[in-house]
Amino acid sequence: MSRYGLQKLYINGAYTDSTSGDTFDAVNPANGECIAQLQAANAQDVDKAVAAAKQGQPVWAAMTAMERSRILRRAVDILRDRNDELAAIETADTGKPLSETRSVDIVTGADVLEYYAGLIPALEGQQIPLRGSAFVYTRREPLGVVAGIGAWNYPLQIALWKSAPALAAGNAMIFKPSEVTSLTALKLAGIYTEAGLPAGVFNVLTGSGDQVGQMLTEHPGIAKVSFTGGIASGKKVMANAAGSTLKDVTMELGGKSPLIIFADADLDKAADIAMMANFYSSGQVCTNGTRVFVPLALQAAFEQKIVERVKRIHIGDPSDERTNFGPLVSFQHRDSVMRYIDSGKREGATLLIGGYSLTEGALAHGAYVAPTVFTHCRDDMQIVREEIFGPVMSILSYQSEEEVIRRANDTEYGLAAGVVTQDLNRAHRVIHQLQAGICWINTWGESAPEMPVGGYKHSGVGRENGISTLEHYTQIKSIQVELSSFNSVF
């Protein structure tokens, strides 16, 4: 028997056997252990979940704003009470260090839910006067049943980022976690029910994106799809959503983000920021600043500071609280990252440190790749152009502000960007010219609940978090009222 046993679907407020009974394994990437068997949903299960959501959503939407707010706040309390339990599951499922999952993943997800729970009573329409005898008022009404499709790198956090605004606005959600990391989304479903969420308002269907994800995006009973993943999959989701019932979509599709260090920067601070922007969570963060631009005159000094810091990284068993760098999420992904590293070597980038998988001792059975830094990189290299989603930093030199802005924007992506400088005039001037949806000055990576998150260009459509996201889970109804007589031309 695996550590977490058989995991069922969550439909209509209860853990439910799938129709087919087919299963797939959840694997701990730190050691290859099968930690759970998960049931795979099929078309009948999708229909059941949609039917349950359609029943539960009107019940949820009919509650007062304060009633809905209290239920979501209770879910926040449960999440925080069970932080360590959920963090341990997340670590086993993703390979992320326990030091991360305990302090970030569940904590920040709960913060987002608390934020939207507090906004529910403030979700209101407008009154628009037309003339003395007439006015218009608007209502913000729920979309109905919406779908969320998650990525594997922040399973619980993404489930909360998607469900919190959807539920706050009075919708029901069917959530499909990544088949690679599904366990904590199933736990979240039980937590919502324990907090008082009506049956059917939050459902979880596990299975592959090609099957379950596609069925959700094409289902006529779904009003909106929020997707996090790669560009190719996102385009397919968007096309299916538009081709079925013209669904609304939110897309977060990754990036190849520039981090620009200017000559006046504190080089130690710049190196610390670059380390967090590349190696946190073993480099598996969509906003990572993997293209690090450094003035040519400072390149050698900066490289030295980076190498010193990489050597201090504590690589190990993610369940050991001393570990701050764990395995990649799967053996398949490890192989993908290694192919990119091999490409960097072939194309002539200079390997400063790393560049290999870790296959000895206690790490021998895990999906580990050493923190890797390339320098003397060119803009046309594969490691500079494509999202690797692993612990691979590319250092590029530049000589002028105009040059680095042009090169930073020379990408199909536009998710994030950052600058490190003591000159705030320059910081704002440059940031305003960078084509990215999330920008940082003298910091990197924090995404507060109040901060809209999303990309330009191929990095996405729409935003997550912030007030505007709550509004995008509603539709506006306009009502005109006439208080005097009505005159017909007929």
Curated annotation (Swiss-Prot):
Its biological purpose: Involved in the biosynthesis of the osmoprotectant glycine betaine. Catalyzes the irreversible oxidation of betaine aldehyde to the corresponding acid.
Enzyme Commission number(s) of this protein: 1.2.1.8
Cofactors, names only: K(+)
Protein name: Betaine aldehyde dehydrogenase
NCBIfam families: BADH (TIGR01804), PRK13252.1 (NF009725)
Gene: betB
Binding annotation for NAD(+): G150, A151, W152, K176, P177, S178, E179, G230, I231, A232, S233, G254, C286, E387
Coiled-coil zones: none
Residue(s) carrying Cysteine sulfenic acid (-SOH): C286
Gene Ontology biological process: glycine betaine biosynthetic process from choline
Site (Seems to be a necessary countercharge to the potassium cations) location in chain: D248
Record-listed K(+) 1 binding positions: D93, V180
Cofactor binding description: Binds 2 potassium ions per subunit.
Oligomer status and interactors: Dimer of dimers.
Matches recorded under PANTHER family: ALDEHYDE DEHYDROGENASE-RELATED
Covalent S-S links between cysteines: none
A Pfam family that the UniProt record links to this protein: Aldedh
Location of the active site: K162 (charge relay system), E252 (proton acceptor), C286 (nucleophile), E464 (charge relay system)
Keywords from the UniProt entry: Metal-binding, NAD, NADP, Oxidation, Oxidoreductase, Potassium
Taxonomic superkingdom: Bacteria
Catalytic activity: betaine aldehyde + NAD(+) + H2O = glycine betaine + NADH + 2 H(+)
Cited InterPro entries: Ald_DH/histidinol_DH, Ald_DH_C, Ald_DH_CS_CYS, Ald_DH_CS_GLU, Ald_DH_N, Aldehyde_DH_dom, BADH
PROSITE patterns named in the record: ALDEHYDE_DEHYDR_CYS, ALDEHYDE_DEHYDR_GLU
CDD domains: ALDH_F9_TMBADH
Sites where the protein binds K(+) 2: L246, K457, G460
Phylogenetic placement of the source organism: Bacteria, Pseudomonadati, Pseudomonadota, Gammaproteobacteria, Enterobacterales
Organism: Yersinia pseudotuberculosis serotype I (strain IP32953)
Pathway in which the depicted protein is active: Amine and polyamine biosynthesis; betaine biosynthesis via choline pathway; betaine from betaine aldehyde: step 1/1
Family named by the database record: Belongs to the aldehyde dehydrogenase family.
